[in-house]
A protein has these predicted regions:
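N-terminal cap/lid segment of alpha/beta-hydrolase-fold proteins
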Residues: 1-26, 241-242
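Alpha/beta-hydrolase active-site loop signature
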Residues: 35, 63-68, 131, 236
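Catalytic nucleophile-loop/oxyanion-hole region of alpha/beta-hydrolase
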Residues: 65-95, 100
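The alpha/beta-hydrolase serine catalytic core
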Residues: 120-249, 255, 262
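Aromatic pocket-lining residues of Rossmann-like dinucleotide-binding sites
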Residues: 52, 116-117
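Glycine-rich nucleophile elbow surrounding the catalytic serine of serine-hydrolase chemistry
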Residues: 103-115
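Alpha/beta-hydrolase
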Residues: 31-32, 64, 127, 232
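Short, surface-exposed "cap/lid" segments of acyl-processing enzymes
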Residues: 21-63
C-alpha cells in the first residue's frame, strides 16, 4: 500500500484528499461525518483506510469544502452532493484501474449519500444514518428509554434511590412521558433519505451499532423489515472496540468483494 496526499477541485475550491492506493479495481470512497477531517476522530478513518487498502482495495478520503485542508464554505452534509461527486471524479482520475466505487459514510455522511442517491457511487455502505432534525434533541427513542427503565427496575440499588428521594422526579417524569410514546416522530430528513435511496440502483447495506443513539433513532424512523439492515451488538457510534471495528471492516470488505465479481 502507498499513501498519497493530494488536492482536487470542487466548484473552484481546492479540497484536500488522501489516497491509500492498492491494485484492486474496486475502490472505497470514504466520506467523513459531521465536521470531521478526513483522518477521522483519533485517526480512525485513516486507520480504516489503511486496513482496507491492505486487503487490496484502494481508498480515497477527502475533506469537503470548508473542512480541514479544503477551501470554501462548510455548507453541511445536506449540501455536500457536489463535494462527493467531485471527490469521486478525482478518485477515478488518480486511480485509473478503479472500475467500481463503494461509498462509505458514518452518521450524517451516510445521510448525505442517501440524499444524493449515491452521488455516482456503484454501491453504498451506510452506517448509523443521522435522521435527527436540526431543531430536535438527540435523546434516545421511546423503545430505548423503556428498555433502560426496565433494567433499572430490576436493580435493587435503583429502587432504593427512588424510595430514598435521590431520584430527580421531574427528570423521571419527562423520561416516562417519552417512554409512553409508541415511536419517534418521523422527520422530513428521514423521508428525503428514503426517497434518495429508493432512486439508487446499486447494492446498499445499512450498518447499525446497537449501542448508538443515532442508530436507535434511525430504527424508529425506518422500515424495521428492511433486509439491508445489519446490526453490531453493543457497538458504539464510532465502533470503538476492537470487536466492533473488526465487524465493520468485515462488512465493508464483503461488499467490496461482491462488487469485484460483477
Amino acid at each position: 500500500m502507498t499513501r498519497l496526499h493530494l488536492a482536487f477541485e470542487c466548484q473552484g475550491k481546492r479540497c484536500g484528499a488522501t489516497l491509500d492506493n492498492a491494485p484492486g479495481t474496486t475502490g472505497l470512497l470514504l466520506i467523513s461525518g459531521g465536521n470531521e477531517i478526513r483522518a477521522g476522530a483519533f485517526n480512525g478513518q485513516a486507520r480504516l483506510g489503511a486496513e482496507i487498502a491492505g486487503a487490496g482495495f484502494p481508498v480515497f478520503r477527502f475533506d469537503r469544502r470548508g473542512i480541514g485542508d479544503s477551501e470554501g464554505e462548510n455548507r453541511g452534509f445536506r449540501k455536500s452532493r457536489k463535494d462527493i461527486a467531485a471527490a469521486l471524479l478525482a478518485f477515478r482520475a488518480i486511480a485509473p484501474q478503479v472500475e467500481r466505487v463503494v461509498g462509505f459514510g458514518n452518521c450524517d455522511a451516510s445521510s448525505a449519500l442517501m440524499l444524493a442517491s449515491g452521488a455516482g457511487c456503484d454501491a453504498l455502505v451506510l452506517s448509523n444514518p443521522w435522521t435527527i432534525e436540526d431543531d430536535e434533541d438527540d435523546a434516545p427513542p421511546p423503545s430505548a428509554i423503556r428498555s433502560r427503565y426496565a433494567e433499572k427496575l430490576k436493580n435493587p440499588r435503583e429502587l432504593m434511590r427512588l424510595v430514598s428521594g435521590k431520584v430527580d422526579l421531574k427528570k423521571l417524569a419527562r423520561g416516562l412521558l417519552r417512554a409512553g410514546r409508541t415511536h419517534s416522530a418521523s422527520s422530513s430528513l428521514a423521508e428525503g433519505m428514503r426517497a434518495g435511496l429508493a432512486e439508487f440502483a446499486g447494492d446498499a447495506i445499512i450498518l447499525l451499532a446497537e449501542g448508538d443513539r443515532t442508530a436507535q433513532v434511525f430504527v424508529e424512523r425506518w422500515d424495521a423489515d428492511d433486509a439491508r439492515i445489519m446490526r453490531c451488538p453493543g457497538a458504539d457510534h464510532a465502533y470503538s472496540s476492537e470487536e466492533a471495528r473488526a465487524w465493520l471492516r468485515q462488512q465493508i470488505l464483503k461488499l467490496l468483494r461482491a462488487q469485484r465479481v460483477k
